[in-house]
């Protein structure tokens, strides 16, 4: 099962692969059951996985920065 394949959620590279896979399924409605579109599917899943990993790493970095800011507030200088 794939995640939501809406175009606004993915990069242009992945959107191209998603559209190619959809086109393959549309043009080869019977052969898709025998693996005709599997190569496109693998490439699309690889692209989606890379997107997921990038988003996860970015979120982790933002979370670490926020934790650092919350638990280690800057020292206020006293006059």
From Swiss-Prot:
Keywords: Disulfide bond, Mitochondrion. It is found in: Mitochondrion. A motif (Cx9C motif 2) lies at residues 37-47. Residues 58-79 are annotated as: Disordered. GO terms for cellular component: mitochondrion. A motif (Cx9C motif 1) lies at residues 14-24. Disulfide bonds join 14-47, 24-37. InterPro entries: Cyt_c_biogenesis_Cmc1-like. Transmembrane segments: none annotated. Residues 11-55 form the CHCH domain. Belongs to the CMC family. May be involved in cytochrome c oxidase biogenesis. This is COX assembly mitochondrial protein 2 homolog.
